[in-house]
């Protein structure tokens, strides 16, 4: 029972933080700008500086102080005197600052509540870094996969209600509604009958991504908790848990009932081999369960979203596949279970035997076709993978050309260092190296062969950053045995900041 209480624990003392006064502080917009700028350095987005002007922020804050109240005209939004003519620009500026402010309660939850306590109250938090241990799991004993397309069309009021559970500040929620209405009235593509946001991964607005993730984590936290108690997840027994407004009030009483009445029988339904992971708009369940059990999971999830979160979900958005015949696609990797044969020679007295063993192993491979497509789109090669020159960079100096190509090559090697087989990665690096040579030869009006012959074999050393050198920097005190063991597969936790070219979607 203590474990369940700890899992569902909510720090109620942090529910009443008032965020609305922070909206009128200029430094909040500076912090939001710096935060987004730092994240965009590796993404090579030089135009971001032009999206925020402190003069605009000062004018906006002055208007916010002078405005007594927000008036939203349902039928005539163009008469709104608060935003004036620069409606889209002001809405975008407020959205950037508000998205930074509304994340504060979630950051606070990562800080220990009292000094001297090293335990972080983050039991319900999820991270993209959970993908790495998922790909390192042993799937040899599992056989079924549920591919789930998470519902992404969400009504505006549902998003506000989700934040209401964590942010007890009515003024901030009213401002959020105001921003939603302004976005709705200003966006010509939103003239549909139903007011809802389509949270597709292609949208880059920070506020929309944050609201989408908070919405997903809202039902994911309940779903994961219920999954830990029973693999069948009978909604008749746990339905009262899903009334989120009174969730933490009822939790103490229900945990006692649960511990007394259900603990004795739930062990029969537990599935200790269930693995769960979420990435972008898709979640995956890998289990040892039978097809009948996976079908129960499928229809439970559909009813779970429809009945308790007001999301219309069709059963066709949940796919059941067999793991040996299925490929998982996460963070630019293609992962699948392969049979790796191994032969062992055994000798007994004068007789020797050859024993063939086939071991199941999850291989993470570099998707060569999508990567070549990305390189072709960026004009490094054609659709067949043949390297071509980059005319747009021919006007740069030789060192700048080599630096740009070398940075892309290093990013790709860094990103796909977790691949179990790097043959495809070597081919991609070859394409980039030859494209660099053709670009330099084009600049000097020479052929590639003559250009390389003149410079010698030491040319393009920027591309020859071997994994042993990377390991020596990452693990300077590691022994040679340690480096040899981990040379084939390394996960870097900062790959989510790498250039868009490495994300081969």
Curated annotation (Swiss-Prot):
GO terms for cellular component: chloroplast. One of its GO terms (molecular function) is RNA binding. It holds the Pfam family MatK_N. It is found in: Plastid, Chloroplast. Its main location: plastid. InterPro entries: Domain_X (IPR024937), Maturase_MatK (IPR002866), Maturase_MatK_N (IPR024942). The lineage of its organism: Eukaryota, Viridiplantae, Streptophyta, Embryophyta, Tracheophyta. The keyword Plastid applies. This is Maturase K. GO terms for biological process: mRNA processing; RNA splicing; tRNA processing. PANTHER family: MATURASE K. Belongs to the intron maturase 2 family. MatK subfamily. Usually encoded in the trnK tRNA gene intron. Probably assists in splicing its own and other chloroplast group II introns. The keyword Ribonucleoprotein does not apply. Keywords: Chloroplast, mRNA processing, Plastid, RNA-binding, tRNA processing.
């Amino acid at each position: 029972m203590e474990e369940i209480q700890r899992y569902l624990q909510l720090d109620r003392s942090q529910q009443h933080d008032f965020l609305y006064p922070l909206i009128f502080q200029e430094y909040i917009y500076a912090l939001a700008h710096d935060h987004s700028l730092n994240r965009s350095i590796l993404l090579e987005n030089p135009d971001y500086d032009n999206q925020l002007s402190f003069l605009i922020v000062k004018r906006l804050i002055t208007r916010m102080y002078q405005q007594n109240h927000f008036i939203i005209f349902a039928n005539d939004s163009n008469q709104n005197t608060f935003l004036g003519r620069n409606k889209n620009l002001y809405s975008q500026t407020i959205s950037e600052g508000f998205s930074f402010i509304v994340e504060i309660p979630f950051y606070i939850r990562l800080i220990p509540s009292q000094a001297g306590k090293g335990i972080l109250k983050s039991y319900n938090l999820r991270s993209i870094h959970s993908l790495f241990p998922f790909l390192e799991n042993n799937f040899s004993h599992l056989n079924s996969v549920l591919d789930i397309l998470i519902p992404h069309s969400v009504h505006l009021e549902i998003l506000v209600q989700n934040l209401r559970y964590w942010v007890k500040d009515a003024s901030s929620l009213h401002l959020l509604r105001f921003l939603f209405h302004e976005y709705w009235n200003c966006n010509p593509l939103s003239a549909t009958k139903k007011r809802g946001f389509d949270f597709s991964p292609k949208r880059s607005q920070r506020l929309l991504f944050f609201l989408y993730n908070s919405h997903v984590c809202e039902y994911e936290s309940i779903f994961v908790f219920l999954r830990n108690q029973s693999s069948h997840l009978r909604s008749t027994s746990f339905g009262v848990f899903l009334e989120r407004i009174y969730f933490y009030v009822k939790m103490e009483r229900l945990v006692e009932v649960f511990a007394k009445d259900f603990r004795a029988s739930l062990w029969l339904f537990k599935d200790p081999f269930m693995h769960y992971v979420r990435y972008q708009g898709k979640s995956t369940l890998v289990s040892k369960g039978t097809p009948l059990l996976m079908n129960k999971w499928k229809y439970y999830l559909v009813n779970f979203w429809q009945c308790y979160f007001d999301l219309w979900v069709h059963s066709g958005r949940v796919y059941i596949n067999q793991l040996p015949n299925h490929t998982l696609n996460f963070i630019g990797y293609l992962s699948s279970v392969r049979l790796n044969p191994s032969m062992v020679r055994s000798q007994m007295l004068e007789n020797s035997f050859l024993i063939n063993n086939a071991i199941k192993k999850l291989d993470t491979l570099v998707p060569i076709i999508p990567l070549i497509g990305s390189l072709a789109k960026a004009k490094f090669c054609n659709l067949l993978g043949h390297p071509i020159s980059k005319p747009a960079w021919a006007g740069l100096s030789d060192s700048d050309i080599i630096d740009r190509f070398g940075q892309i090559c290093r990013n790709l090697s860094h990103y796909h260092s977790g691949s179990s087989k790097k043959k495809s990665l070597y081919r991609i690096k070859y394409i980039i190296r030859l494209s660099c040579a053709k670009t330099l030869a084009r600049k000097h009006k020479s052929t590639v062969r003559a250009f390389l012959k003149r410079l010698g074999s030491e040319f393009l050393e920027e591309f020859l950053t071997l994994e042993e050198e990377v390991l020596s920097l990452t693990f300077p005190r590691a022994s040679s045995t340690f480096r040899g063991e981990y040379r084939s597969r390394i996960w870097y936790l900062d790959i989510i900041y790498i250039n868009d070219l490495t994300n081969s979607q």
